[in-house]
Amino acid sequence: MKNQNSLRYIFALFFLSFAAHCQYIFPDVLVKFKPLVQEAIFTGTGSPTWDEQIRERGYILKEKDGYHMWYTGYTKNDPVKHLGYATSKDGIQWKRHASNPINPQQWIEDVFVIKKGSKYYMFAEGKGDTTHLLVSANKTDWKALGNIRIKKTNGQPIEKGAFGTPCVIAVKGLYYLFYERDDLGIWLAKSKNLIDWVNVQDQPVLNKGPEPYDLYGVAMNQVIYYQGYYYGYYHATAYKDWREWSSNVAVSKDLIHWTKYPQNPIIGNNQSSNIIVPAQQGFRLYTMHSQVHVYQSN
């Protein structure tokens, strides 16, 4: 009996320690969210316009003058995916840009935007799920810079095929790119100039599975730095046919070794392509596919 009590005590200590560690590396402000608005705050028009429907990851930047959103619109009558732009004072009520779609001749979806100096750089998927780079001085007129180039650690180009859902973070003078290949895993590359990239390693830094919620596909949407850790917000699917996706989070100290949140997914109900935006208190979480919903951290 004494031995059994000792084992129970040891297991209790282990689980308490594990729970405390999870609370430390996954603070509630980054993983616990409640709806700020119950219904979707931005959707496709539902009528035969260029943005009858929206899809994939859009991106939101919060600046001094308000919120700026880039999104992908499409219609059943046109296979090309187009870029839209909208603005908001509060991040909830959005106004579409009068000249949408912007850059109407280019296939643009799954966008990610960073600001470097006075210019904005957009990473986006083109036709065939390959990533290309664009630059703008005013957020609406974008100049194409061509496909980014990714090499393996041995200097050879990565194998032909998809390299999409680009996600970029700047760290100590370098840029780090997370990308997926047919949602089979998430790879990491680095660059000094945003166009030429070299893999940090040739294997994924975040794999799908083994848990059911991300068993059949993963893609990184955004990585932020918070109190000594990197937090990666990614979407995933538990279904082989990809019929439904969820929003999830993982943590890392070095961008290479990741620990998934034990209570993933943080948002279900087929709300995915999740991004984080700072708020007056805590953070907002926006899920961008296939309607935009907004959540507030607890």
What spans do the regions from the language model cover?
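Bacterial N-terminal signal peptides that target proteins for export
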Residues: 2-10
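N-terminal hydrophobic alpha-helix used for membrane targeting or insertion
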Residues: 10-12, 79
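Hydrophobic h-region of N-terminal signal peptides that target proteins for export
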Residues: 13-21
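Carbohydrate-active catalytic/glycan-binding domains of CAZyme proteins
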Residues: 23-298
